[in-house]
């Protein structure tokens, strides 16, 4: 999902400029939910779709959200925090997919500019398969593959930039559990994969020319 990642992150980054942030406003599910980000029930949320698929995103009570999509485009959305930290994140729910998709803790840092994923579940594409293998880390009942890649002149939260992409990809897939982000951050740092000042950090559902649906609850705020 190499091209998918860069396309999505650019669009998510752009939402702050393209759409006024919403505060404590529930999105109404429709054929294509408008792009946006903001806070809802104290949780940060972000949603973006390229409009190529029938896709809906709905903020629910507390840290819950739901998303459903049809084939034909790119989309990503979820709830969490802004800024991110080395917190332990607990999430639960259902995640159904047919094709290329992720369920992941997803975030960005600046100085250095880094896009990161802790992938908990994925569809037909393992994102670590086309990145530099950096070993493994065991956390929360599973081994995770660690990988790193360089995105050259790609869209980012700060416009078109060259930046690093960090991955931890869980081998025992799941759709509910706890993620100790400190374990992953420490493992990355031990391999020279350093982070900077945190921007947002969400439990995200992504789809790329696939179909699926998810109902996820995150332990935010």
Swiss-Prot record:
Catalytic activity reads:
Endohydrolysis of (1->4)-beta-D-xylosidic linkages in xylans
Which first-to-last residue range defines the signal peptide?
1-30
Q: What does UniProt say on post-translational modification here?
A: The N-terminus is blocked.
- The protein, known as: Endo-1,4-beta-xylanase I
- Which residues are responsible for catalysis? 115, 206
Compartments where found: Secreted
Q: Which Gene3D superfamilies match?
A: 2.60.120.180
Q: Has keyword Hydrolase?
A: yes
Q: What is its main location?
A: secreted
Entry EC number(s)? 3.2.1.8
Q: State the GO CC annotations.
A: extracellular region
Q: In which pathway does it act?
A: Glycan degradation; xylan degradation
What organism does this protein naturally occur in?
Answer: Cochliobolus carbonum (Maize leaf spot fungus)
**Top class in the EC scheme:** hydrolase
Q: Which SUPFAM superfamilies match?
A: Concanavalin A-like lectins/glucanases
Biological process terms from the Gene Ontology for this record are:
xylan catabolic process
């Amino acid at each position: 999902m190499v091209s998918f990642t860069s396309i999505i992150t650019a669009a998510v980054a752009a939402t702050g400029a393209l759409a006024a942030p919403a505060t404590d406003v529930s999105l109404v599910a429709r054929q294509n939910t408008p792009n946006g980000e903001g806070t809802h029930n104290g949780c940060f949320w972000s949603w973006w779709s390229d409009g190529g698929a029938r896709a809906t995103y709905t903020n629910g009570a507390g840290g819950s959200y739901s998303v459903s999509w049809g084939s034909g485009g790119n989309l990503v959305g979820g709830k969490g925090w802004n800024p991110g930290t080395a917190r332990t994140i607990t999430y639960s729910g259902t995640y159904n997919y047919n094709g290329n998709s992720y369920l992941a803790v997803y975030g960005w840092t600046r100085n250095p500019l880094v896009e990161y994923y802790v992938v908990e579940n994925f569809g037909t594409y393992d994102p670590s398969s086309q990145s530099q293998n950096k070993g493994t880390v065991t956390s929360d009942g599973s081994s995770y593959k660690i990988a790193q890649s360089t995105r050259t002149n790609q869209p980012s939260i700060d416009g078109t930039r060259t930046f690093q992409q960090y991955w931890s990809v869980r081998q025992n897939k799941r759709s509910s559990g706890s993620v100790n982000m400190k374990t992953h951050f420490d493992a990355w740092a031990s391999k020279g994969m350093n982070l900077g000042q945190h921007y947002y950090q969400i439990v995200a559902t992504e789809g790329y020319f696939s179909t699926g649906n998810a109902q996820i609850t995150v332990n935010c705020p």
